């Protein structure tokens, strides 16, 4: 496998799906990602939503919205191109998008339109008006079913509070049945209980998909508002840091050691990095036996936090942190307070 990975890593092919050869076999590579859009709002009020901060009366206007779309489409189109130039990701989960109209405007931007990127979205109940969505390239990922599973408050005192649900998309990639659960768990303005509740409910959705089809390759991705080391991820969702630790009912979290050992993250706060943006996967995406690696179906290869200089603040007090759209009431013409994440999959071409 080392030779295969070296060939893939050094190859310069820009085919629809990158193909590499090793030992007389051919392999295809796919990228998937997640990116919190940090308040991708249009300039119009949505009835019943608290979107007033992003209206012209508060200084959010057509010029700023157009710049935001241009910036985000650039970053989204670049995700995955480290390995797959001119191809990018088969699908990308999104958080903090306002509505379907915003997604139409986003996918109409030249970098995404050139790849015919489409989107899945169902309007949710969040009072701020922010939803999850999934961008996808129909040449690489075929969508078969989309549903929004509601976040159910576990405490009676919270029954009136509505927040973001779990966007669940089933489809096919590389001939494999694939499901994606896109999440944006409750913020840290609330206690850890609510993120642990989100993890419990996410696990129920994941387990139901596997009961229906044990061969389904399931990804849970999103802004968890918790790190890989937190209880919600490590204990409740059972997302383990090492492939050798992953058992039945568990998931694999390749981001744990990136934070815990390398100190890298996606969100910079109070002088340190958090890694709230994660993509975890079911065991059937792993090669657990190092001596008998099987690539007849999609398997995990590698992952990274996606960093480009244009995504990073280059000067001032917050030098080195993600370049935001605005901060402290000042428009920065940036991207997001989060960095994107990307992981790569390989499958033998039969």
Q: Which ranges hold each PLM region?
A:
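Metal-dependent phosphoester-hydrolase catalytic domains
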Residues: 15-24, 207-218, 226-350
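Active-site-proximal beta-strand/loop segments in catalytic clefts of secreted hydrolases
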Residues: 35-38, 95-98, 121-125, 137-138, ...
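A long, amphipathic alpha-helix that forms part
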Residues: 192-214
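Structured beta-strand-rich core segments of catalytic domains in phosphoester-bond hydrolases
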Residues: 97-177
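Beta-strand-turn-beta hairpins that frame and shape the catalytic cleft
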Residues: 24-32, 41, 140-142, 161-184, ...
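N-terminal, active-site-proximal structural segment of metallo-dependent hydrolase catalytic domains
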Residues: 14-110, 114, 120-132, 200, ...
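Extracytoplasmic/secreted cell-surface and envelope-processing proteins
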Residues: 42, 101-104, 128-131, 189-192, ...
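Bacterial Sec-dependent N-terminal signal peptides
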Residues: 1-19
């Amino acid at each position: 496998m080392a030779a295969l990975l070296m060939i893939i890593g050094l190859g310069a092919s820009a085919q629809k799906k990158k193909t590499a050869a090793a030992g007389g076999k051919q392999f295809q590579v796919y990228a998937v990602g997640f990116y919190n859009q940090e308040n991708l709002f249009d300039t119009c009020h949505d009835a019943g939503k608290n979107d007033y901060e992003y209206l012209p009366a508060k200084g959010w206007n057509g010029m700023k919205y157009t710049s935001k779309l241009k910036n985000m489409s650039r970053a989204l189109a670049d995700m995955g191109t480290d390995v797959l130039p001119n191809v990018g990701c088969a699908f990308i989960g999104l958080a903090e998008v306002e509505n379907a109209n915003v997604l139409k405007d986003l996918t109409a931007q030249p970098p995404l339109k050139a790849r015919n990127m489409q989107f899945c979205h169902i309007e949710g109940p969040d009072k701020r008006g922010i939803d999850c969505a999934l961008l996808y390239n129909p040449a690489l990922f075929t969508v078969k079913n989309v549903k929004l599973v509601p976040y159910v408050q576990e405490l009676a005192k919270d029954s009136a509070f509505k927040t973001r649900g779990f966007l669940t998309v089933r489809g096919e990639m590389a001939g494999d049945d694939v499901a994606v659960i896109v999440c944006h768990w409750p913020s840290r303005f609330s206690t850890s209980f609510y993120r642990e509740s989100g993890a419990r409910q996410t696990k129920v959705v994941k387990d139901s998909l596997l009961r229906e089809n044990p061969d389904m390759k399931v990804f849970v991705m999103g802004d968890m508002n918790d790190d890989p080391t937190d209880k919600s991820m490590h204990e409740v969702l059972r997302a383990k840091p090492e492939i050798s630790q992953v058992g039945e009912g568990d998931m694999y979290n390749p981001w744990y050691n990136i934070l815990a050992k390398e100190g890298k993250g996606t969100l910079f706060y109070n002088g340190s990095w958090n890694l709230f943006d994660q993509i975890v996967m079911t065991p059937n995406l792993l090669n657990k036996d190092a001596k008998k690696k099987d690539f007849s179906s999609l398997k995990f290869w590698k992952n990274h936090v996606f960093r480009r200089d244009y995504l990073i603040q280059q000067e001032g007090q917050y030098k080195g942190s993600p370049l935001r759209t605005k901060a402290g009431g000042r428009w920065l013409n940036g991207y997001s307070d989060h960095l994107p994440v990307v992981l790569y999959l390989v499958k033998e071409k039969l």
